[in-house]
């Protein structure tokens, strides 16, 4: 009898655990819950940055819940390093799950910059010094010019989108449905220094 009672209690605990998990599953978040979570900025862990208004908050909340460890490591990297003094190159954060690429390049005229998107990774873009324009568009509203290349995790497009000026202190996030057109000049052949953190996308 005691053995049956123990199994019954364990079953109840398992069901309760699954129920609790269902209550916090990212797909169950309401718009208000997403907005509250986003506005609290606890996920920044004190990092003095501003998320750009173009960020899809619902997708961000879901990805953060699914891969919290990856996101925390990405934001910790930004907080713990003096980006202004770091050389251009690739920096490991969590193997192939999270890594950073710092570049210092002249910005381009808009016709030289391509629309792109990625399936396996989310892009976090942050200008460290200088400025650039970044285009943002829904991939469903663009025309594919280069089919998905699995080795490069890259797809290119043509079409129209919205353009924003990226400056130090504000970061952009681009998810698989977000085409982006970065490194565009704001006038003249100005160089800028930026960091892109690649964060593995959770299906």
Regions found by a protein language model. Give the residues of each.
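Short proline/glycine-enriched turn/loop segments at secondary-structure junctions
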Residues: 184-188
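A short, N-terminal "cap"/entry segment at the start of jelly-roll beta-barrel domains
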Residues: 34-102
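Mid-length scaffold segments of soluble, non-membrane domains
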Residues: 82-144
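Bacterial Sec-dependent N-terminal signal peptides
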Residues: 1-29
């Amino acid at each position: 009898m005691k053995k049956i009672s123990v199994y019954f209690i364990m079953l109840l605990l398992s069901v309760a655990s699954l129920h609790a998990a269902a209550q916090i599953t990212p797909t169950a978040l309401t718009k208000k819950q997403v907005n509250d979570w986003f506005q609290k900025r606890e996920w920044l862990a004190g990092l003095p940055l501003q998320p750009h208004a173009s960020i899809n908050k619902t997708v961000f909340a879901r990805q953060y819940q699914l891969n919290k460890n990856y996101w925390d490591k990405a934001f910790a990297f930004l907080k713990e390093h003096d980006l202004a003094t770091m050389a251009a190159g690739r920096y490991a954060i969590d193997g192939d799950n999270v890594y950073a690429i710092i570049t210092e390049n002249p910005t381009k005229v808009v016709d030289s910059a391509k629309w792109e998107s990625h399936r396996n990774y989310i892009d976090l873009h942050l200008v460290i010094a200088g400025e650039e324009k970044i285009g943002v568009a829904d991939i469903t509203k663009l025309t594919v010019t280069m089919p998905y290349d699995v080795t490069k995790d890259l797809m290119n497009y043509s079409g129209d989108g919205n353009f924003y000026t990226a400056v130090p202190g504000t970061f952009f996030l681009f998810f698989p449905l977000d085409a982006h057109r970065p490194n565009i000049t704001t006038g003249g052949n100005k160089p800028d220094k930026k960091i892109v953190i690649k964060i593995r996308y959770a299906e």
